[in-house]
Amino acid sequence: MIASRYVASELESVTRKLELQLYERAAISEVLEQTSTDLELAKANEVLQTIKEEADACVAAINGGQKFYTIKYDQILSGLESLSGGQWSVGSPLEPLIRDGISDYLHILLYYALLSKNLAKLPQLLLDQEYYGHVSRCSWFMRLFYGLQIMPVKLIEFFRGHALQELPSKLRQTLRIHNFQLVGLPTQRAWQWTKLPIAMVDTDIIQKTASLDSQLDINVKKFGKLLREFPRQKSDRLEVLSDFLDLKPGSSEFAVVRAVQKWNVDSCAPQPNWIVRYWPTILIALAGGPAGIAAIWNARNDIAAFIKHNLFEFARDLVKNWLVEPLRNIWSTVHHDPTSSIAIMSQGTLDTEINSLQRMLIDFLKEHEYANTVDTSVLMKEIEQGNLTQFMEIYEAQLRKPIRNLVTGDLIRSLLIQIQKGKVDGSLAIHGIDKLLQSQQLVFGIVSISPALLILYVLCNSLTKLVKYGTVWSKGAKYRRSVSVSLNNVERLLNSPIEEFDGDKGNWNLGLLTLEMANLREYGAKLVPHSRTAEWCRDIDEMASSSALSTTGKLNVINRIYHVYGKYF
């Protein structure tokens, strides 16, 4: 939380100061003996220990990164009440020490409580103000729908505030009719009275916006004054707290604690709750509810079959056919499993085709040449290389006497050999394609698994958003916009001379600056990676500290935020 480090350091400073003063006192044995015999002093010491335990718990919560720590007011109030009527021993050496310790701890804890409540409630006022500003900028249809949403609430408020007998007079004050002409409307034509609902909605929005502006102005100024005065007035912090709580000067610590416990900021014009926003939808659903429920019940078997087929079986087949099988194929490819090779033609087809061609050519050449002149080994190598010179010479000779060779069958045999040669060439081409496919088999396996990986990535991303943001829909754009707006407002407020204004202007700027830094810290922590959240909070806390850095130093921190964390926004 913003300024929590200041609270923790102040509480630790009080503890060190108290321990040092105890050490500097007279003999500890005498002190303990006197404490045991003086009932009021012993009771005060118990109250001090109770408040100190509360302070230590608060420091531990701050150091542990807890957003807000809830103070146990009942224990503090019961302890203060027990001391309210007690008489202290005259000349007790521990009397001022215990009194000061209780007051110091108590004032800082109360300051932390008010700080926590303001940082929790005032941003909600800003959100309410932004909500009504957004509604005012919507189209006339959306403004009419907003009017429909709040109509039941408005009617209830109206009838609670006015008796039924006063209703006609109130309506006449709202809309006066003279000689069948509407008076008081922004237009001069009577038929444009249809714009009255829009005018009423706009008036309601303007009134709520004005009320929120006034409430924000008062509370932000008081918050800024508390932030400014409490660290300065170390000797009169109780009066600073009393002034913030609008208590009388000189109020007791018991009264201040009670006032802090009850203090709260409720929006004078909160956003409509979900019942107000969705009652038209709920009403429509209830109107068609019985028929819809009956239709669903009658079609329950079809719905169950649809869910089974399109959800469960889809998930099973997706994992089996698009994840497990491609992974198995990729594993087989990496291990050079011959049974998993991709091929267009069956294995051994090319060798069979070539061997058949070799036998056909050798037999053909032996029949047309002297058998002893044919070197079979050389001829087989030539055929493997595609060299058919001897066969083509015989074929060319046959073409000189085609009819005779056709009758004898030699020409037909030559043509069949050439057909076989074409088959071999085709098999060689297909074999080359097979080699290419086998070389890219790993790529094909990865491509085949890509759809399943994409679906798994979307599911994992949705689950991460559900855990981190509480919804499967992305809020990154919303958080980035909020961070951008807060950074702009912080830099604008830092450029204004806050230190030069000690009145309402300075208090307003300081309070608004602290609220913007709190929003910046909260929304930025959702965008920054978890490993860098501590750095982000440290930088924002440095910028929020009123004494750690000057205005120039804080502006330099803004520049560092842009440079270091800009890629996340």
Curated annotation (Swiss-Prot):
Keyword set, alphabetical order: Membrane, Mitochondrion, Transmembrane, Transmembrane helix
Main localization (coarse):
mitochondrion
Report the leader peptide range.
none
One GO biological-process annotation of the entry reads: mRNA metabolic process
InterPro entries assigned to the protein according to its UniProt record, in alphabetical order: NCA2
Top-level taxonomic group: Eukaryota
| Topology of this chain in the membrane | Multi-pass membrane protein
**What PANTHER family does the record tag this protein with?**
NUCLEAR CONTROL OF ATPASE PROTEIN 2
Q: What does this protein do?
A: Involved in the mitochondrial expression of subunits 6 and 8 of the F0-F1 ATP synthase.
Q: What is this protein called?
A: Nuclear control of ATPase protein 2
Q: Which organism is it from?
A: Eremothecium gossypii (strain ATCC 10895 / CBS 109.51 / FGSC 9923 / NRRL Y-1056) (Yeast)
